[in-house]
Curated annotation (Swiss-Prot):
It comes from Methanocaldococcus jannaschii (strain ATCC 43067 / DSM 2661 / JAL-1 / JCM 10045 / NBRC 100440) (Methanococcus jannaschii). This is Bifunctional thiamine biosynthesis protein ThiDN. GO terms for molecular function: ATP binding; hydroxymethylpyrimidine kinase activity; phosphomethylpyrimidine kinase activity; thiamine-phosphate diphosphorylase activity. PANTHER family: HYDROXYMETHYLPYRIMIDINE_PHOSPHOMETHYLPYRIMIDINE KINASE THI20-RELATED, PHOSPHOMETHYLPYRIMIDINE KINASE. Residues 236-417 are annotated as: Thiamine-phosphate synthase. 4-amino-5-hydroxymethyl-2-methylpyrimidine binds at residue 41. Pathway: Cofactor biosynthesis; thiamine diphosphate biosynthesis; 4-amino-2-methyl-5-diphosphomethylpyrimidine from 5-amino-1-(5-phospho-D-ribosyl)imidazole; Cofactor biosynthesis; thiamine diphosphate biosynthesis; thiamine phosphate from 4-amino-2-methyl-5-diphosphomethylpyrimidine and 4-methyl-5-(2-phosphoethyl)-thiazole: step 1/1. Residues 1-235 are annotated as: Hydroxymethylpyrimidine/phosphomethylpyrimidine kinase. It is an enzyme of class 2 (transferase). Pfam families: Phos_pyr_kin, ThiN. In the N-terminal section; belongs to the ThiD family. It comes from the Archaea. It catalyses: 4-amino-5-hydroxymethyl-2-methylpyrimidine + ATP = 4-amino-2-methyl-5-(phosphooxymethyl)pyrimidine + ADP + H(+); 4-amino-2-methyl-5-(phosphooxymethyl)pyrimidine + ATP = 4-amino-2-methyl-5-(diphosphooxymethyl)pyrimidine + ADP; 2-[(2R,5Z)-2-carboxy-4-methylthiazol-5(2H)-ylidene]ethyl phosphate + 4-amino-2-methyl-5-(diphosphooxymethyl)pyrimidine + 2 H(+) = thiamine phosphate + CO2 + diphosphate; 2-(2-carboxy-4-methylthiazol-5-yl)ethyl phosphate + 4-amino-2-methyl-5-(diphosphooxymethyl)pyrimidine + 2 H(+) = thiamine phosphate + CO2 + diphosphate.
């Protein structure tokens, strides 16, 4: 698969064509690019917008279209020569354009004047989808109204925000729910629209492409890279296949260990998709990790989504405090071990005696432990209760990280023996 990205060059690689390339590569799609402008910027300010000359832009189009068969095009920051040239190529090659109308930077530097806005309207009328944020959508609609312009009715418009609204004939047809993440991340619009384009090129229908791209961009936000003045987008794709691969490798690592911290009820290990909604978004063993008579262990069952509501409830509760935490494993409790672990790990706990009636123990206990700690610790334990075995739960960003923590815990436990 090949998609073309047309837009500005951001030397910090947080946005623009650098972010487009990273996004497409992460999704397994090749992405040639056409640069319209060089925009020295960072999370503090835009220094300037230097537009490349028309002849250079035409030569970039010529080079790309001579080399590749292009069907899908994603656009970011555009100039008049870039739009004029693209319009000709749309007619010649019947291109499907996903236009992200970048009207201004997050630092409020304007990329568009009235004449260029008129050109954008011309491009919208030949696009398949436009993806303005809700502020940009409002400005576009006001400009159209004030200048007696028209946009064709069958254009798909995705007005983006926390929740995104897909429209056709200017009427909402689907809402894509999101989550508020307390980070101002540079480049999310680029990542989102490029991801939609990439999924469309893979054969997804529009609604499925948006749904998958939404999950992708949310992951890119929670794993965003911190720099001096803010956060830069970090294209990250965690789908069901990735979760199952992580769990499979984590179990492989576990098999190589002399793992003895197995509770009487057995252990299980789980990992979720980003922002899990319910236990169906969490994969785990359909069985358990259980002791054998030779001092080793058996791994019973397969890895499947929705396999364990019990351990899923821990992840579902913890992810509300920190969405990066997506994995958990339960292991044997030992009071002496807990004392030693407090020197190496962040540890919190809950007391089953304080559990209110009619609640899920795991959801309530995880919430209490996280509130006590002020975030998600590495370890949450409880000392059990009537008919309930005491337990240690190890949490982490993925199943591999969890097993590596368990390996350290096992070594510490071995010193007690």
């Amino acid at each position: 698969m090949v998609i073309l990205a047309i837009g500005g060059y951001d030397p910090t690689s947080g946005a623009g064509i650098s972010a487009d390339i990273k996004t497409a590569h992460t999704l397994g799609v090749y992405c040639p690019t056409i640069t319209t402008s060089v925009i020295p910027q960072n999370n503090k300010m835009v220094y300037e917008k230097f537009d490349l000359p028309e002849e250079n832009i035409k030569n970039q189009f010529k080079a790309v279209f001579e080399e590749f068969d292009i069907e899908y095009v994603k656009t970011g920051v555009l100039t008049k020569p870039a739009i004029d040239t693209l319009l000709k190529y749309i007619d010649k090659y019947d291109l499907k354009v996903i236009c992200d109308p970048v009207l201004a930077s997050t630092t409020k530097f304007s990329f568009v004047d009235e004449k260029l806005m008129e050109k954008y309207i011309e491009l919208f009328n030949k696009s398949f989808l436009i993806t303005p944020n809700k502020e940009e959508y409002k400005k576009i609609m006001e400009f159209i109204k004030n200048n007696n312009l028209m946009i064709r009715n069958d254009l798909y418009i995705l007005a983006t925000g926390i929740d995104d609204i897909l429209m056709k004939n200017f009427k909402p047809i689907k809402t894509f729910k999101g989550f508020r993440v307390d980070k101002e991340v540079h480049g999310t619009g680029c990542v989102y629209s490029t991801a939609i384009t990439a999924f469309l090129s893979k054969g997804y229908d529009l609604e499925e492409a948006i749904k998958e791209a939404k999950r992708f961009v949310l992951s890119s936000v929670i794993y965003a890279k911190k720099s001096k003045f803010g956060y830069n987008s970090n294209p990250t794709y965690i789908n069901k296949e990735k979760v199952i691969k992580n769990l499979s490798y984590a179990i492989y690592l576990l098999k190589k260990m002399n793992f003895t911290l197995i509770p009487e009820v057995g252990s299980n290990i789980a990992e979720s998709l980003p922002f899990p909604k319910d236990f169906k978004d969490v994969a785990a063993l359909t069985g358990r990790i259980i002791k054998n008579k030779l001092g080793g262990f058996y791994i019973v069952g397969d890895i499947e989504f929705g396999a364990s509501e019990h351990i899923a409830k821990i992840i579902l509760s913890a992810s509300k405090f920190n969405p990066e935490i997506r994995a958990c494993m339960n292991i044997k409790y030992d009071g002496g071990l807990i004392k030693l672990l407090k020197d190496k790990f962040a540890v919190s706990s809950f007391d089953r005696k304080e559990e209110p009636p009619n609640v899920s123990t795991m959801e309530w206990g995880t919430k209490i432990a996280c509130e006590k700690f002020g975030g998600v610790p590495d370890i949450i334990y409880d000392r059990g209760g009537e008919g309930k075995e005491p337990m240690i739960r190890v949490l982490g960003r993925d199943a591999i990280e969890v097993v590596k923590k368990v390996e350290v815990i096992q070594k510490i436990y071995n010193t007690l023996m």
